[in-house]
Regions:
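Short alpha-helical transmembrane segments in multi-pass integral membrane proteins
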Residues: 1-22, 79-146, 188-249, 305-370, ...
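Short runs within selected transmembrane alpha-helices of multi-pass transporters and secretion channels
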Residues: 72, 76, 141-159, 167-178, ...
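Small-residue hotspots at the loop-to-helix junctions and early N-terminal turns
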Residues: 48-59, 138, 202, 274-289, ...
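Transmembrane alpha-helix boundary and packing residues in multipass membrane permease domains
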Residues: 25, 29, 40-41, 77, ...
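Helix-terminus/linker motif at the lipid-water interface of multi-pass membrane proteins
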Residues: 30, 34-52, 121-128, 184-195, ...
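N-terminal transmembrane alpha-helices
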Residues: 9-41, 45-46, 62-74, 78, ...
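Transmembrane helical elements of multi-pass membrane transporters/channels
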Residues: 20-39, 140, 151, 174, ...
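Small-residue-rich hydrophobic transmembrane alpha-helices
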Residues: 51-115, 148-167, 280-343, 374-396
Length: 459
């Protein structure tokens, strides 16, 4: 049965596996980022306040869908480990339990979001129309939570089998659909329908995400491991649930630390007005697009590490980590001149406001300096998830995003009285110290789990 799985990552060329897995993942994430940027673009056709509102509402929503990313990583790691150990029935059971768990978690999160989401938005925003836009955007998006969590649970199961193409196809389709239906929902059809205005942005996301979920469920059903959903399996074997939750929570919380870090930035920027918030949110989307090469590589690293760790091929784990870190580091060095030269031109696509563009350019040029550090941070996160040490990811995130981010931004803004650029510098300094901690933790974990990082060999 294992031979029918899309790819056995315990044999063959490591760079070849990266090439085959990372490119579809990166392409998929390009369209996922463009999918998210579509909302910012169409909001810009309404007002700067609408853009600022979407930025804040999406961040709070992202805090909840971090559970989806946690489930994705947990499924990729656990199913990949099971396949590496040739435990096919266990891998099948994990997929069933993961999807069932995604349904339960999403219902709980929807209730939590309705109660707490508007309170968080009020905390990081000032009274005004952009706060109202944030709350409206967030509350409608909550109805897409089940689809999002199930989609990424399915994606983790497919990634573990070496399938990175299904999510790519789903996201490409979702992007083209969203750019068609969003303007129709916002502005309507001349002489036929007036549209629903701003709320059409979030409603289009709900529609597209549910279609992505249906497609990925079909792909899991068609995969070698299949989909075996029954009430009996879904409601029993709590050990399976425990293993998934144990792997999910630290990864989820590490994503949430990223959101907390962004909310800290939003909180610091609210005193500079909606133009600063809009500039940051547009700049952040552009930066996410530039990070996609290393995000594709680091997502590919997870199933490679997971399968080889499960098969006790520790030297291949080391080689995969080295390859991902070095290739990502060099790629981000190449990307920075692109930011410097073309950043302003890209921002003009989203807004005509010179103040918004100025803020966005300053963010991209300062934060762009630390992009190579992100390559190593993300690589280490995938390595830790693959060797079943996701709790370490949380501690790195808490230290970097939760503590140092707030501390250094306060130093530059509150103590030194810097302008908006002080927020970017403070966040950058926190990334540097988080990078140092991640290297230290990776070294310690590698010594315990795979016999160290520094054994010599050739890829």
């Amino acid at each position: 049965m294992v031979d029918k799985v899309k790819s056995d990552l315990t044999v063959g060329s490591i760079p070849g596996h990266f090439y085959r897995l990372a490119i579809p993942m990166a392409i998929g994430m390009v369209f996922y980022t463009l999918y998210n940027m579509a909302g910012i673009y169409f909001a810009g056709k309404l007002s700067t306040n609408a853009q600022a509102g979407i930025g804040i509402g999406h961040l709070v929503y992202f805090f909840l869908i971090a559970f989806g990313f946690g489930l994705n990583a947990a499924m990729a790691g656990l199913v990949g480990n099971a396949l590496g150990e040739r435990k096919i029935n266990e891998a099948k059971l994990l997929i069933t339990k993961g999807i069932s768990l995604a349904v339960v978690i999403s219902i709980i999160l929807m209730v939590f979001g309705i109660i707490c989401g508007p309170l968080v938005i009020n905390l990081v925003s000032e009274v005004g129309s952009y706060r109202e836009y944030s709350v409206r955007y967030f509350l409608i998006l909550l109805s897409a939570l089940p689809a999002f969590l199930i989609s990424y649970t399915c994606n983790g199961a497919l990634q573990a089998q070496g399938d990175s193409v299904s999510m790519q196809r789903a996201l490409i389709g979702a992007f083209f659909l969203i750019i068609i239906i969003t303007p129709i929902l916002i502005f309507g059809v001349p002489n036929l329908w007036l549209g629903i205005g701003f709320d059409g942005i979030s409603l289009s996301v709900v529609i597209c995400q549910n279609l992505v979920m249906v497609f990925l469920l079909i792909q899991v059903k068609r995969s070698a491991l299949g989909l075996h959903l029954t009430w009996k399996v879904s409601l029993t074997n709590f050990r399976g649930n425990y293993e998934i939750i144990k792997q999910m929570i630290p990864g989820c919380m590490s994503f949430q630390m990223v959101i907390i870090g962004s909310l800290v930035v939003q909180f610091a920027l609210k005193g500079f007005g909606p133009n600063a918030l809009a500039g940051y949110n547009i700049g952040l989307r552009i930066e996410q697009l530039l990070l996609l090469p290393i995000l594709g590589m680091t997502q590919a690293l997870l199933p490679i590490v997971a399968q080889n760790y499960g098969a006790k091929n520790f030297q291949r784990v080391r080689l995969a980590l080295y390859y991902c870190c070095s290739a990502g580091f060099v790629t981000m060095i190449i990307v920075y001149p692109i930011i410097w030269v073309f950043g302003s031109s890209v921002l003009k696509v989203f807004t005509p406001s010179s103040e918004v563009i100025s803020v966005g350019v300053s963010y991209l040029r300062i934060d762009g300096l630390i992009l190579p550090l992100y390559a190593i941070l993300f690589s280490i996160n995938s390595f830790l998830q693959g060797v079943k040490r996701p709790a370490s990811i949380f501690w790195i995130g808490l230290f970097r995003q939760g503590l140092l981010n707030a501390f250094f931004i306060w130093i530059f803004i509150g103590v030194l009285g810097c302008d908006v650029w002080g927020v970017w510098v403070g966040a950058g300094v926190s990334v540097f110290f988080g990078w140092m901690l991640s290297i230290f933790i990776a070294y310690k974990v590698a010594n315990k789990e795979i016999g160290g990082l520094w054994q010599k060999s050739q890829i």
